[in-house]
């Protein structure tokens, strides 16, 4: 799947293909599918923690100080930290791979599968604005994964 996303005032074209996962692994020495599985697990935990915190916040028995202690514990939880790391580290890397696929020829892609080119690209994008579109990047990647994972009859 291919889509253009506006980041700040610039438009960026992103593409997900059957090669996206392999290119990601080559560039960053990590398996994006493993990262996504971990993220999903931590996201579920975070939702449970959030629901527990909401109950705590609505409780009339707890003091404001106790609520703040619980909120701090939630924000320091492994689930919160891991989901934040996925959003701020893994998704921009995935966006970079999908940017290469949409904008570079095949031979050029292979020369740019490294941290240096990733950092160079990252310097051209506003970090906060990139983080606001990571959901769209995930949607493109998942749509590309689905379109390449259909069983053949």
Give the location of each predicted region.
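Short, surface-exposed, low-complexity cationic segments
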Residues: 18-38
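Charged interaction scaffolds used for protein-protein
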Residues: 1-14, 19-21, 41-44, 54, ...
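Subset-of-secretome marker
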Residues: 47-51
């Amino acid at each position: 799947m291919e889509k253009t996303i506006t980041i700040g005032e610039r438009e960026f074209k992103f593409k997900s293909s059957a090669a996206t996962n392999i290119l990601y692994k080559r560039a960053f020495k990590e398996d994006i599918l493993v990262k996504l599985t971990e993220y999903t697990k931590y996201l579920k935990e975070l939702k449970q923690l959030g629901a527990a915190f909401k109950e705590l916040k609505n409780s009339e028995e707890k003091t404001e100080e106790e609520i703040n202690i619980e909120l701090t514990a939630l924000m320091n939880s492994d689930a919160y930290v891991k989901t934040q790391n996925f959003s701020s580290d893994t998704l921009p890397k995935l966006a970079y791979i999908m940017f290469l696929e949409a904008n570079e020829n095949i031979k050029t892609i292979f020369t740019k599968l490294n941290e240096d080119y990733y950092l160079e690209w990252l310097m051209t994008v506003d970090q906060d604005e990139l983080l606001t579109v990571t959901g769209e990047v995930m949607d493109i990647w998942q749509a590309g994964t689905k379109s390449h994972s259909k069983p053949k009859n």
